[in-house]
């Protein structure tokens, strides 16, 4: 499939501003209004010209901070900000970049707890293609983690490498159907109905395939997690393109 023909979604974690303020920034960019959705994730959203919702949600994994002069200090959970895009097309990458620039100007920054998750439409991937993707990732994972400088905390908990027992069984049984592959992924149980099934916390997340129809890549840091904590719009474009290849 041509890279420009693929749908994607992106989730970008950050702090430094509140969810309410982040939603205002997004609404200002689109020329629409901020809306409060509430719920478990205390979410806000703003619609674009196509009436697609760009959500701002709370995420429990984010260490919340705000600026106090030149210092960064602890902040309450209002500063837990995860930007969740609607289903996007290749042309929307520029929109994602502009939103990140606007949020950064408004005070958003990142720290080592913040990551980026990118979803690619799984519809074109049958079981053999998914197996091939798993093997490619397994062969390149160490290099990818080094290149992306994946934080050790995220690697150990939220962005684990491919499980060796899963990989061995996958290549031994060589599934030809999604159902067979699902059985291997969940080791005989069907966890696809659980949103927070533990198997989702891998760099290459196939739980997302069975739960929502997307392949999720979770290896990316939100930006420069050093003292500046900058969010890089250019890197985000490169990450999206990497997942589409």
What is each of the regions a protein language model found here?
Residues 1-109, 123-245:
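C-terminal accessory/tail domains of diverse enzymes
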Residues 112-116, 120:
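Short, conserved phosphate-binding/catalytic loop or strand-edge motifs used
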């Amino acid at each position: 499939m041509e890279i420009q023909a693929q749908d994607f979604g992106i989730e970008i974690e950050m702090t430094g501003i509140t969810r309410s303020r982040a939603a205002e920034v997004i609404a200002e960019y689109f020329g629409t209004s901020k809306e409060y959705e509430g719920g478990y994730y205390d979410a806000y959203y703003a619609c674009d010209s196509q009436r697609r919702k760009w959500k701002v949600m709370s995420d429990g994994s984010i260490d919340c901070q705000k600026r106090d002069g030149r210092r960064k200090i602890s902040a309450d959970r209002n500063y837990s900000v995860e930007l969740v895009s609607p289903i996007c097309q290749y042309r929307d990458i520029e929109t994602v970049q502009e939103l990140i620039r606007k949020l950064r100007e408004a005070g958003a920054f990142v720290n080592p707890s913040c990551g980026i998750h990118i979803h690619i439409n799984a519809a074109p991937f049958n079981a053999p293609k998914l197996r091939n993707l798993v093997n490619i990732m397994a062969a390149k994972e160490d290099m990818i983690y080094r290149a992306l400088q994946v934080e050790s905390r995220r690697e150990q908990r939220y962005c684990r490498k491919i499980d060796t027992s899963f990989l061995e069984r996958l290549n031994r049984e060589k599934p030809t159907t999604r159902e067979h592959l699902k059985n291997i992924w969940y080791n005989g149980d069907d966890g696809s109905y659980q949103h927070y099934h533990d198997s989702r916390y891998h760099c290459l997340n196939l739980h997302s395939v069975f739960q929502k129809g997307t392949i999720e890549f979770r290896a990316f840091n939100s930006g420069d997690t050093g003292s500046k904590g900058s969010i890089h719009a250019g890197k985000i474009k490169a990450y999206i393109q990497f997942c589409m290849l």
